């Protein structure tokens, strides 16, 4: 695998997913948490979040070793990433990026830093994620969209493991989760799905519909447990054997996604919508 640059391809495409008020939904590069809350929890999860600077835009990533972060492959543009700010605050440490290694098929990328970060790192979730499990999404999209100086988080419940999601890459195997207490908007691409303080998924896509109130209420995550060997090979990270087996794979075209009803706006400090590519 080389560190050659990757030309970003828009993942936006109309998808026949199920929603009470929006039968046509786009699965687009997933995006900032709006109407959410500041990242909380252990210092491990809050310190490990990374804001990746990509020209005039940004993505989110997660530190998994002192020198390696993981993010979405579609976040890596032609020419690469300029730098990374590590931690949940804009006062976090900043480093230039040495290289980015792209997964050959999945929407994953590994970003190497030249120096060890002083932040904590996270372990991969030790089991294959199952429907019904609850976790937290975290991201830096609010920094660009709303001027938030602290990374934001929302709650996610995994609904199913899917393939054939209406998008350019119908072969992608993804964890589909509904988002509550916040919504995904541009800038959270590549961000973590934490379960029990460990990294279970990397954000790849989110809903993008005509009714803005439904945007970002469903996210699709790359299941990192299914790519543990690739991650360990390039980063040198020790990864314990993954427990259990992957959940049943559901065809998302034959069995369309259910989009939950829009949540009421709470008037939090990051209200409003900023929709577009990451």
UniProtKB/Swiss-Prot annotation:
Residue ranges of domain Peptidase S1 in the record: 33-236
UniProt signal peptide: 1-32
SMART domains the UniProt entry points to: Tryp_SPc (SM00020)
One family name in Pfam for this protein: Trypsin
Active site (catalytic residues): 74 (charge relay system), 123 (charge relay system), 189 (charge relay system)
Molecular function via GO: serine-type endopeptidase activity
Keyword Protein biosynthesis included in the entry's annotation: no
GO BP term, example: proteolysis
Disulfide bridge partners, by residue number: 59-75
One of the record's GO cellular component terms: extracellular region
Keywords: Disulfide bond, Hydrolase, Protease, Secreted, Serine protease, Signal
Keyword Protein transport: no
Compartmental location: Secreted
Alphabetized PANTHER family for the sequence: FI18310P1-RELATED, POLYSERASE-RELATED
Protein family according to the UniProt entry: Belongs to the peptidase S1 family.
Protein name: Putative peptidase Cgl1093
Species of the source: Corynebacterium glutamicum (strain ATCC 13032 / DSM 20300 / JCM 1318 / BCRC 11384 / CCUG 27702 / LMG 3730 / NBRC 12168 / NCIMB 10025 / NRRL B-2784 / 534)
């Amino acid at each position: 695998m080389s560190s050659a640059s990757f030309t970003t391809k828009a993942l936006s495409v109309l998808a026949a997913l199920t929603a009470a008020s929006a039968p046509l939904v786009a699965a687009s590069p997933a995006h900032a948490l709006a109407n959410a809350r500041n990242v909380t929890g252990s210092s491990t999860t809050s310190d490990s979040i990374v804001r990746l600077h990509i020209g005039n835009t940004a993505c989110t990533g997660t530190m998994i070793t002192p020198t390696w972060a993981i993010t979405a492959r579609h976040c890596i543009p032609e020419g690469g990433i300029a730098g990374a700010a590590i931690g949940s605050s804009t006062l976090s440490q900043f480093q230039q990026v040495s290289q980015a290694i792209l997964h050959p098929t999945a929407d994953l990328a590994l970003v190497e830093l030249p120096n060890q970060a002083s932040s904590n790192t996270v372990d991969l979730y030790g089991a294959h994620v199952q429907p019904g499990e609850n976790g937290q999404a975290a991201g830096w999209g609010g920094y660009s969209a709303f001027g938030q100086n602290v990374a934001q988080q929302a709650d996610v419940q995994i609904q199913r493991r899917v393939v054939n999601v209406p998008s350019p890459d119908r072969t992608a195997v993804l964890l589909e989760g509904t988002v509550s207490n916040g919504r995904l908007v541009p800038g959270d691409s590549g961000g973590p799905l934490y379960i029990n303080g460990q990294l279970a998924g990397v954000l790849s896509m989110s809903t993008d519909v005509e009714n803005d109130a439904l945007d970002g209420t469903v996210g699709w995550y790359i299941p990192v447990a299914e790519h543990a060997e690739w991650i360990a090979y390039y980063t040198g990270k020790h990864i314990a054997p993954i427990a259990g087996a992957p959940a049943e794979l559901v065809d998302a075209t034959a069995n369309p996604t259910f989009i939950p009803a829009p949540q009421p706006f709470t008037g939090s400090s990051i209200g409003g919508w900023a929709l577009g590519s990451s």
